[in-house]
Amino acid sequence: MEIQRPVINLMVLHSQHDKSDNLSRRESLAGKSKWRTSLSRSSSSSSSNNNSPTKTEIPAEFLCPISGSLMADPIIVSSGHSYERACVIACKTLGFTPTPPPDFSTVIPNLALKSAIHSWCERRCFPPPKPLNSAAAEKLILALMEKKPQRRKVSVSEKELIQAIRDKPSVRLNHAATELDRRPNYFNSSSDESIASSSRTLQLTTKPSCFSSPSSGEIESLEPNLTPEEEALLTKLKSNRISEIEEALISIRRITRIDESSRISLCTTRVISALKSLIVSRYATVQVNVTAVLVNLSLEKSNKVKIVRSGIVPPLIDVLKCGSVEAQEHSAGVIFSLALEDENKTAIGVLGGLEPLLHLIRVGTELTRHDSALALYHLSLVQSNRGKLVKLGAVQMLLGMVSLGQMIGRVLLILCNMASCPVSRPALLDSGGVECMVGVLRRDREVNESTRESCVAVLYGLSHDGGLRFKGLAMAANAVEELVKVERSGRERAKQKARRVLEVLRAKIEDDDLVENEEIDWEELLNSGDVSRSRCRLGGEKSCVNSAEF
């Protein structure tokens, strides 16, 4: 018993020691886990801070100029700016004009910018932006209106009245605006083709080639609302039977071709929506008739912007790319007709209408090439489209067509627009535009006066800045001789432009003669010890790269 007590005491002490060791281990583990938790939290917080980009890191083009936040639903307006959709709607509702003042007349979804923003957010592990609701947008615009006093805006009716006074002549016209001049349904693609002077350019270009207007008397105006017959046509357009759809399309095509007032009454949101769904039909006859109907509807000036805003341009571009031959003819006519409206020019370029037109101007039928060329002429009146044409390689292609005598008159009209723009002018100089124009002028007996005048207009545009590069290229191509001929025997406007180009070139010749005829005292020059300054003087430039003394 005495021996067992010490053993029991040892066992108790040992168990207490084990408990204390276990307790200390638990405390140490708990402490380590706390450190791990705190470290993980700090690291996660730091990583989250790193993943959330600041406003300075967000690309400026992703931010709405009005709200200053990342755009969830960006749209592009006629002036070329991109905004959040809700902000634009609020501005139009409240009559607010931000700075710089944009053009909100045409609103197009900017899908490319939207996808770019989402891709950027995914790469940065940043949540994509949510669309701004209308209430928040109006609250934001009201706050901006309080800061910026607004001038009294002219109402829409007043704008239309003022514009009508400016546009309409004082004489009474008996024909519609779209009936100013009939263009032929074919053209001669050789170098002998006849092109009207630039003063009559717009008279050539008021109708697509695929439209032929019948001779008819004055037609009574229809009611603005759809009649029961028109409602029946709309019902047939939505039918599941192809025969009924074709019957309705042929009927609408005939009505809108004869009755001008029906173009307005039938150009409603419901009708355009039904036509839009039929453009991509797999039946060629349906596609042809739909595009023909759109040609007729687009002839009315008030319908042009409405048709573009309906979103019908992208499917038309698809037809230009892969539709039937006849459908391509009509689609080119629709694009040309819509491009006559200034508000549509930027939108058509943004939606990708330039590239298929450039393709069809070379390989399409005569009607397609004709309307494609005139569509490109009107679209190239906008600077943003001229920049796109340069990127698409249009300058080299168009100059090649001029050299080969293909559609030379219509192509020169496009090149005149390109030569007048500082964005596209360098591309013309790089691609041999000066030499090409002088070469056409040398074919004096083969080209008509309009073609010669267009060539001189291109040279005049290229000489606008009076750069040494143009002067050198013109002198190398011996342009002076051909311009002198135009100055003596050309039309009055061609004479004036040729005279101005010659003044630029003659100034270059006089400068060169002055340098060549200058007497130089070489002995005095060598004794002066200032050779570098004399070298700069001899070079005719203010500074010289190799100006070190020798």
Swiss-Prot record:
Pathway: Protein modification; protein ubiquitination. ARM repeats lie at residues 260-299, 301-340, 342-381, 383-420, 422-464. Residues 38-52 have a biased composition (Low complexity). It comes from the Eukaryota. Its EC number is 2.3.2.27. It is an enzyme of class 2 (transferase). Residues 57-127 form the U-box domain. GO terms for molecular function: ubiquitin protein ligase activity. Residues 19-55 are annotated as: Disordered. It comes from Arabidopsis thaliana. Pfam families: Arm, U-box. This is U-box domain-containing protein 40. One of its GO terms (biological process) is protein ubiquitination. Residues 19-29 have a biased composition (Basic and acidic residues). Keywords: Repeat, Transferase, Ubl conjugation pathway. InterPro entries: ARM-like, ARM-type_fold, Armadillo, Ubox_domain, Znf_RING/FYVE/PHD. It catalyses: S-ubiquitinyl-[E2 ubiquitin-conjugating enzyme]-L-cysteine + [acceptor protein]-L-lysine = [E2 ubiquitin-conjugating enzyme]-L-cysteine + N(6)-ubiquitinyl-[acceptor protein]-L-lysine. Functions as an E3 ubiquitin ligase. Signal peptide: none annotated.
